[in-house]
């Protein structure tokens, strides 16, 4: 499938998004477990949906959260979406009180319409993105140059400007 080993080029974390008016008065991650809170998640088979559930499991193991935190939050889920953009759209349209998305999904287009609630690093799930030249690539030299660009400072700066986490320097 690939000509050489793939390389890590960017990473992403999860955040909780809330509608600007925040009528459910969500101030902390623990509030997601309160009865009556309407939450939208990506479906479990979608990467962000899987990562969201892993976050809930990690939180339930912390003393600051109830041991049944995951079950209580999942009981509040009103919709499971096929992709992360649909999660953001439902929260933006005020069809839910909260949703879990990637940090990069809080784009400038929606940033004014949504609030961000951070998930601390010890509870968060790191999504890692890899890049490689495929064996069937018609222009492997050009693809290789593109990969070099993405891994170098200019490419990492562009990714960082769009909310991705920079990867350690390659040698």
Positions of PLM-derived features:
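Exported/periplasmic ABC-transporter solute-binding proteins
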Residues: 7-12, 18-171
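N-terminal post-signal-peptidase region of extra-cytosolic proteins
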Residues: 1-2, 129
